[in-house]
Amino acid sequence: CRAAFGFQERPDDPPQLDATSVGDLIPRPVFLISRAEYRKLLVFLRKVGLVTFRDPRSLPKHPVTGRVLSAGILGADKKSGAQRLLLDRRPQNAIEERLVGLSLPFAGDFVRFELGPSEVIRTSLRDGKDQYYVLRPDDARVAWQAFGQPVDSDWFPDDAIDGAPWLQPYFLGLMQGDHNAADIAEAVGRAILCDSGAFPVDDLMPAGRGPRMRRAPGQGVALVSDLYIDDAAV
């Protein structure tokens, strides 16, 4: 499906899927929250300064499907009985363009280290798979952080936008995701692409936790690139 994404086809490529077929393979983000809970959630996030609203017509759109790039949301019960909020961004992260100007790196860029002979990293791995952080991005990044579904303007009359039919929530923090979610999404995404015939199995990029930058004894230099199609924010 290279052509559908605007890339040049190669002579040895298998028959290409058209844009409609590719779009059918791309899952929609999940939205598992009731209307009443959704409103309470947005009121709370607005109160603590983690949400803003914009005109949904200005949203970036998927280059193949034309759907707006908005993350799904759902809740998950924790062992303590509390709930965690999950933002589901699976369908868009693989094709999201780098922002113009100064932008923050993707979550995968934060897990690559190369140490010299005398360098040491000391850390606790008790909860290492859930390295969690929230950063305050600039306005350019916020435009790519829509989540949930648009809401009626009368929900938040103080934030009403002239001419906008609805208000689209935007998340104001950049949140690192859980590597477990990335692994699952990567495996599922590969299976979908291979089963559909979009990519031959031997043409896939190897995936790993980061590049092996040094030469192993008796072997050539190996460079393994991360292939993240998910950064589910917790």
Predicted regions and their residues:
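Nucleic-acid-interacting cores, centered on viral/eukaryotic replication and modification enzymes
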Residues: 1-234
